[in-house]
Design a protein with these regions (language model features):
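Acidic, histidine-bearing metal-coordination/catalytic regions of metal-dependent phosphoesterases
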Residues: 19-124, 129, 145-146, 257-258, ...
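Active-site neighborhood of glycoside hydrolase catalytic domains
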Residues: 185, 281-291
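Active-site neighborhood of divalent metal-dependent phosphoester/pyrophosphate hydrolases
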Residues: 67, 116-239, 260-262, 267-277, ...
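Substrate-binding clefts and catalytic carboxylate motifs of secreted carbohydrate-active enzymes
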Residues: 279, 290, 306-364, 370
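Structural motif
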Residues: 36, 223-224, 311, 351, ...
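Bacterial N-terminal signal peptides
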Residues: 8-18
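Glycan-association/targeting regions that enable binding to alpha-glucans and other polysaccharides
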Residues: 22-49, 59, 374-477
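Bacterial N-terminal signal peptides that target proteins for export
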Residues: 1-7
Length: 477
């Protein structure tokens, strides 16, 4: 039997905070901080300063590939961070780390594919809360390992830092996280965003020290055809965050390389049962998800499983069964397609414009399945048109009310359609069901353009669930 390692943040009652900081260690964690297609970052900590090196090789060709030259760290340190670059896209690697104090660890990671049509899988694993229910947390993690995804995504509440009674409790909580996920962290790239229990608003929290990420709060992650918008929903700042999110959603919506836009964050805007959805997110973020056609929104926080009916066209999935105490859910609510209170994780099978999900209990039993299809209707080139600049609107009528239209008219307005700018026939662009129109952005536009589409023969309109598609204009040069 494999020897189990306790990832101990050594804690003795007589030690102060500074002493704690000198006596903890962590396992190796693989995350993406740069381009997921060609890089990965490995990070870990030791009790004492040491030098370290990393060796790695393509797992599928070990005989022909001798592996890259090991990367060495010249200066002794307690924290070791290695970013491996120039990797092959869509490849599984084995790695070994060594430090001069005798520590050796081995694990695996995967690089994202360069080909957007290359299939892959990922698992969603949320809400351990430091293994409050250790047996459940270990069982769910073992299930993730058995499912063998290419990487793991998490919307947080990994530990219970916020509600720990003292510093020793914080240490113990993270220690349980590492203990429960020991095999999972060694087997996969683990890409989290913070939950409220992780204390992301506290710059001195372990969240900021443990995870090497593009940003500790909000960041963008491109994996194959998916653009993940990883968002911190803990400290909500209303208009300023919404403005940033609108720009990122527009970039994704109008980028031809992005097939899927998937926001992922901790608190759910919609949840039915013992823990409800977040009203601030419904006010500020949900209208943006609708306007810019988010393909799927992932959250946790409510400890159970809820696959919602599409709300204004947007599918929402709440998965919080990673090991915290379970909450009751309401499977009969009209917003809910399927819900249950169970420990679980979710496997996503990505293949081009289709994602199939399987919600699984720790033993691998699939209790819910669903299929999603990428849903983008409108693209604008350039993505942020400037005043006086010529731009093109492409409208995909397939699957919508204008699918069979003999002619489609572009109805374009300034800001919230408080002034009509354009009402012109669109042209077919050679792709079935797709129409284009080119125009120059008037100088009178202050903030954004608004689009909807019209079939003049039948008198049928298409906007986005009573909200017009948006295009923020570029800032003044």
């Amino acid at each position: 039997m494999k020897a189990r390692r306790m990832w101990v943040f050594l804690a003795f009652g007589w030690l102060g905070v500074s002493a704690f900081a000198r006596t903890w260690e962590t396992p190796v964690m693989a995350t993406w901080t740069e381009d997921p297609r060609t890089s990965v970052t490995l990070a870990w900590e030791r009790h004492a300063e040491a030098t370290a090196r990393v060796a790695y090789r393509d797992r599928n060709h070990p005989a022909s590939d001798g592996g890259a030259e090991p990367i060495a760290q010249a200066e002794p340190s307690r924290r070791h961070v290695f970013t491996l670059r120039d990797l092959k896209p869509g490849t599984h690697y084995d790695y070994s780390v060594y430090s001069s104090d005798g520590y050796v660890a081995r694990g695996r990671f995967w690089t994202a594919p360069a080909d957007p049509e290359q299939p892959f899988t990922f698992a969603l694993h949320n809400d351990l809360q430091g293994g409050i229910n250790v047996a459940a947390a270990k069982a769910v993690s073992a299930g993730v390992v058995q499912a063998n995804p290419d990487f793991v995504l998490s919307t947080g509440d990994l530990a219970d830092s916020r509600y720990a009674p003292d510093y020793a409790g914080v240490i113990a909580s993270w220690n349980l996280f590492f203990e429960c996920l020991e095999d999972e962290l060694a087997a996969f790239t683990f890409q989290p965003v913070s939950g409220n229990h992780d204390e992301p608003e506290n710059p001195d929290s372990f969240w900021h020290r443990l995870f090497e990420l593009p940003d500790a709060h909000d960041y963008v992650l491109d994996v194959g055809p998916i653009r993940f918008l990883m968002l911190d929903s803990t400290e909500f700042e209303g208009p300023s965050r919404a403005a940033w999110l609108a720009r990122e959603l527009q970039k994704a919506a109008f980028d031809p390389a992005v097939v899927w836009t998937i926001p992922a964050f901790h608190r759910p805007p919609f949840s039915e049962g013992e823990r409800g959805g977040d009203a601030s997110l419904r006010e500020w973020w949900v209208p943006l998800f609708t306007k810019y056609e988010a393909d799927l929104v992932l959250s946790g926080h409510a400890h159970g499983y809820q696959r919602m009916q599409p709300i204004d066209g947007v599918p929402y999935l709440v998965s919080g069964g990673g090991g915290g105490w379970l909450y009751q859910v309401d499977p009969r609510h009209p917003n809910v397609a399927f819900a249950t209170s169970a420990y679980h994780f979710v496997v996503f099978r990505v293949a081009g414009k289709t994602i199939r999900i399987e919600a699984q209990t720790p033993d691998g039993t699939v209790f819910d399945r669903a299929e999603y299809v990428a849903r983008r209707h409108v693209r604008v080139e350039p993505a942020f048109p400037a005043r006086g600049e010529t731009c093109t609107v492409r409208y995909d009528a397939q699957g919508g009310p204008l699918e069979d239209a003999a002619q489609v008219t572009l109805h374009l307005g300034r800001d919230e359609f408080n002034h009509l700018l354009l009402d012109v026939p669109m042209e077919r662009d050679g792709v079935p069901g797709t129409w284009t129109a080119t125009f120059t952005v008037p100088d009178s536009v202050k903030w954004h353009l608004a689009f909807c589409f019209f079939d003049p023969a039948r008198g049928v309109w298409h906007n986005n669930h009573a909200r017009n598609w948006q295009a923020l204009v570029a800032p003044e040069r």
